[in-house]
Amino acid sequence: MNAVAALPTPTIHTTCAQDIHDIELPQWLEDCLQQWQREIEQGQDETTAPHCLICRAFCFAYDLHAQQRRKSGEPYIAHPVAVAGLLRDLGGDEAMIAAGFLHDVVEDTDISIEQIEALFGEETASLVEGVTKLSKFNFSSTTEHQAENFRRMFLAMAKDIRVIVVKLADRLHNMRTLDALSPEKQRRIARETKDIFAPLANRLGIWRFKWELEDLSFKYLEPDSYRKIQSLVVEKRGDRESRLETVKDMLRFRLRDEGIEHFELQGRPKHLYGIYYKMTSQDKAFEEIYDIAALRIIVESKGECYRALSVVHDVFKPIPGRFKDYIGLPKPNRYQSLHTTVLGLTSRPLEIQIRTEEMHHVAEYGIAAHWKYKESGGSENATLTSTDEKFTWLRQLLDWQSDLKDAQEYVENLKQNLFDDDVYVFTPKGEVISLARGATPVDFAYRIHTEVGHHMKGARVNGQWLGVDTRLKNGDIVEIVTQKNSHPSLDWLNFVVTPSARHRIRQWFKRSRRDENILRGRELLEKELGKTGLEALLKSEPMQKTAERCNYQNVEDLLAGLGYGEITSNSVVNRLRENNVNNVKNSQSSQEVTLASSPQVHPPTPPATGKDNSPIAGIEGLLYHIAGCCHPLPGEPIMGVVTRGARGISIHRQGCHNLEQMDGDRLIPVRWNPNTNNHQTYPVDIVIEAIDRVGVLKDILSRLSDNHINVRNADVKTHLGRPAIISLKIDIHDYQQLLGIMAKIKNMSDVMDLRRVISG
């Protein structure tokens, strides 16, 4: 960025502080302006005095916004002053604070970026330009525009991460003053804040911004729920604070007895949106949310963190499965702390966090606690390259974003992988791998290396053979077993969650099976449009234009992309409609195809014979049985094995360890028949760990009965001071039903863990 000589350089009135009467300045800014005035009076150059950049930026913004008012009626300058103050509180450098004052100047006045650069330097101008561009993005627009706006935002962040921090401060103050807008605008801005900016603040570790953005969004999106929860929190505050003070007194004595002299005990109230999220996602009442109030212990060293943890577990009984060590395994945003949940007073669960002062600073201020440019004085240190470790998530987004042609899929993957929490698993050598929550061994394999994923045969998780679609949990040790003649399955696309794995699987099918993919693409398009006139449509000029609009050179490439899942048939049909194609006539046959207002849905043809009614497709007329080692369910990837004897085909889950023992020529591809009306059930073994109390088994069985799940067998094992182990054999129709009932049981307040038991 270079200054343009032809543009006039505006004048900065250095005496502006003496003329301010319409707003009350914060004390820090008053002190800064007074010091700057003294330096000028003592003969220093106004452009080189120690406080010049911040003060000159304020005076410049004050003059430009002097005649402007916000919707609330207050002077407009109050907003830039508030934004600059938020950035100062985060520890931002002078360029950031100056950008806070100037961030609306280019958009709302006649001043150009070149003039900003001439007055305040390239670094400040670059930040102002970045924020100005972000302000023009509409994240609630059409999917294609939304995807492009996301891409531009991440590129701006990669160039200088401070741009998005200034934007977050701008958004936070706008949310604080949202009352002056119409209800419709309030909801639109609140939705965008909740979906985009609060998760970004979380990824950057700026907890102070994150919780307030979430609570303010909640206030405008769900006003009735917000007021109700706010009232309940206030109503119970006295009891909570009394219990916390008693707990503090108990711990204060024991910590000193342990030799930990310097520490701080803080109450940590749960924020309103966090309470609402738990109530809705876990189907719990307000009274069942045990961590509405929590305790934080701040000590001086990492060693004292673990000593303090020992004290806590001596004083209060820890609840098994509720301990997390984020010191040994930090979050991607560099958050570190020990989390434990104990049975506190009156046997109510109490969450306790333990961290050092430095860890606490990082937890509150996030990336602001790590900015290296403050030490070196160079802006280039704020870029992505020098802080790779802290921004692996952003680097991954930049790596794969250009590979996805389908805008809708890009936005969905983005929201899942940027805004969801991560899960941390280990390689057999102890290396930590961070994956999106819900990731499977297939996602893990492709994270290790593309070829590991391509030749994956199965996976051992914690030493046990599990299905390749198993959802990984924190702390799992994952080992991928490969075989030279193994290759990806299209079924993997149904359960992988990371964009990199999804893209590499599709690339493999794109390269290796082009003819099959074209045929499959035709079939998918035929389902959307109907068979009549399809040939004419595929040869038409509008179809060629549609292929080009979808970034393919020709229709065959588009069909291949459909076949291996790079783009969806729904997206293709939508592009056709955008081209205003209503009918395409076949000149030879006079047949026509019509693009309906919505995609055609063809109901499945009822099976004509008993053979067609088989749950398994691909072995019609053959004897088969469901393998007892792995108990596959409809909806799970399966493989057939030709048995030695008269038992016919044995149906196994893909990834079953018994498949490893089989000769390759005995394996045959099979799949579940989606058209069957055979509603049989299949046995599934699950193990539940629950708090040992009277009636816990009854409550679990009632939950199963309410969902029409038959229980074949139940067994309970208890040991004093340990959770109850409940083993159940239940009848399940398909994999989706299993996932649904497991989620409902996990949400029960007494349930600590639940897993499916598979021997194969």
Swiss-Prot record:
It catalyses: guanosine 3',5'-bis(diphosphate) + H2O = GDP + diphosphate + H(+). Residues 76-175 form the HD domain. Keywords: Hydrolase, Manganese. GO terms for molecular function: guanosine-3',5'-bis(diphosphate) 3'-diphosphatase activity. Its cofactor is Mn(2+). Belongs to the RelA/SpoT family. This is Probable guanosine-3',5'-bis(diphosphate) 3'-pyrophosphohydrolase. The gene is spoT.
